Amino acid sequence: GDGMSTPQIYAAMLASDSPTSFERFPVSGLVKTNSKSHKITDSAAGGTAIATGHKTNNGMIGMNSDSIAVPSMLEIFSEKGMKTGLVVTSYITHATPASFVAKNINRNNYEEIALDISQCDNVNLLIGGGRKHFTDRKDGRNLIDEMTYNGWKYHDTLINSTENNEKVLILAAEEHLPTSAERGDFLPGATSFAL
């Protein structure tokens, strides 16, 4: 997680009657995600550290502490000809996933972040929630329609397949997706689709 540490992981392992997902990982690593401005990070600064390798101030996404945009690993991979994507169960505009595809000084600028995402040309697949930030906007724009016009294929639920070169946007909820107990096999299905 973007701000989680080993004590939280170990506590979950102790509380669980069965092995946690973390115990099934073949390898593990640690990254220091404290923010530039605070000893305790938030999802924006933590997500930016993971996505870009740059520390930033709490609340900022996709840019360094001097408010200068920095490339995320998705941008770097895309420039090398690789396909990229994000699969999340939160808003796609939420701080952690947004750190991979948007640049903003305030993690709560959801409509601006959605606009950044809609204009992002270095990602091929976006799956998550947060549809309202693309459609129910103060500026009256429908970013899903704009993305569709620009070649994206939009769906509001998981699909079985797509053409290899299509850009796909799946926003399966107005806000966050339901809890893991309520959403069933959405995440494994979305992950399989992405791969």
Could you describe each region identified by the protein language model?
Residues 1-137, 141-161, 166-167, 185:
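N-terminal catalytic scaffold of extracellular/periplasmic and nuclease hydrolases
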Residues 158-195:
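Anion-binding catalytic surfaces of enzymes that hydrolyze or transfer phosphate/sulfate esters
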